[in-house]
Swiss-Prot record:
Domain of life of the source: Eukaryota
InterPro entries: F-box-like_dom_sf, F-box_AtFBL13-like, F-box_dom, FBD, FBL60-like, LRR_dom_sf, LRR_FXL15/At3g58940/PEG3-like
PROSITE patterns reported in the protein's UniProt record: EF_HAND_1 (PS00018), FBOX (PS50181)
Keyword Repeat listed: yes
Protein name from the UniProt record: Putative F-box/LRR-repeat protein At5g41840
Organism the protein comes from: Arabidopsis thaliana
CDD domains per UniProt: F-box_AtFBL13-like
PANTHER family noted in UniProt: RNI-LIKE SUPERFAMILY PROTEIN
Entry annotated with the keyword Coiled coil: no
Keywords from the named record: Leucine-rich repeat, Repeat
LRR repeats mapped onto the chain: 80-105, 137-165, 189-214, 217-242, 254-282, 329-360, 361-386
Amino acid sequence: MKSRKKVVVGVSGDRISGLPDALICHILSFLPTKEAASTTVLAKRWKPLLAFVPNLNFDDSIYFHPRARRNKYSKSYESFMSFVDSVLALQAKTKTPLKRFHVKCEDVVDQSWVLEWIPKVLKRGVLDIDLHITSSRNYCENSSFYSLPSKIFVSKTLVRLKIQFQDGVHIDVEGGVSLPKLKTLHLDYFKIETSMLNKLLSGCHALEELVLANLMWADSSEDEACHVSVSIPTLKRLNFCRSEDFYEGEFHFYEDYDEENINEGVSLSFDNPNLVYLEYSDVIVDKYKQVSFDSLVEANLRLRKTPDQDETDKVNVTKLLMGIHNVKILYLSDDTLEVLSCCRERIPVFDNLLELTIKTTPYVGWKSLPPLLKSCPSLETLVFEGLHHKYTKRCGDKDGCLCKYENHWGTKKKKNVRTCLSSSLVKVLKILKFGETFEDENEDGLDVDHDDYDDEDAVSCDEVGGVVEEQIEHVKHFLETMPVLKQVILYYNTPKDEDVMKVFKKLEKLPRVASANCNVQISSKNLSLSSTSTKRGTLL
């Protein structure tokens, strides 16, 4: 019988060094570049391998020691920028193709320095660029936006491009635009002329995901009215957001920016037959020339009036709403509710809408909800994000609101008014952030400041307890009115279990509910309670 030799591998055995260089480079490509560079001390053979790593991922949070962050302009701070330079210079000598170039910085000494890296990686045929720069330089009135290098708009290899400079960048497409392979484009905090945006999008024939966030229109030398067209047949996801933080925050120091002319003379067109997701946040433009989303499944609308429009001004967003009428899932912000309450024309019918989420605040009434719900014949799930309500003169009118109160000389008064809820086919009702309070509803008993919104109509609680009691009354009204409810879920915004118990007991005492069989569930971070009520209010 032949003896078998037992092979013992020591704990210190090096199995990685025996791997081919290409495989080691592949392994290193999954590490942050700082850590990949640190591996060169393991063996002489490893030192040149960093030059061939196809994925570069620079993160200053990994590079810096926490104490070094206290001095933004220390040598260690600038050494991060120099480290990126040295790695790019090392790889440039090998002319190795580059797949991914990611940079994430919270502290950058010079953002123009970051932009100088873009042409260098473009020469290497990079597929994926992601620059996430959240630091801010010192603001001054003469500051200007940095410009993206024009070469970035004629890349034959780019598949994914994400640019976020919190200081903002200026996009000026001097020559042509040709991005034949680009599928994902994210631009965040940027300024561009409307004509330049049209030119940019016209060169992205394969685009599937487009994010235009924190967008500012640059001054245009053109005399004719500005028109923006987002028409990309391949597009599947679109995020078009002009955030108030950008044009009302620190960025207004860069130029004299007139908030009253945010969208003056601007018209929009959307023609995207394969789009399935839309997020649109903006003040109302002059005109929506065309809105066509044939395949839309989900939409998130955050419409706002312009600063020079008051509550009584009529607006026309009918064409925009018609363009999304086939959506199945819809989210509406509180500002959008206000816009809908001022529509010149009727809200179109949303035949396919199954789930509707509504954000509420104490500053916006529910005037637009009855006509909206009447326009959703297939609605099954209704979600309130917060259950805040502003009492107006319409409360108490037939289909003037969803509450059971009227505003009687500045006080709430119960009134039995038949609303559209009595014919609602909604089966699931969810209340997110139940018990949430705003600053003017907090425990200090601060009065609501009505100077900014129709103080003649407004009536509000001045205590947290009162706010919760008011929200309980709304839930009771829903239970007593909605005939086919199967489930009501309250996500209570409280750390106290006794708060959940109190609300649960109040809902238990309902003498009757409209639905034959409805499950009521209250959940907080620590506790979840549920019960089933019959039409007579009996708990099962």
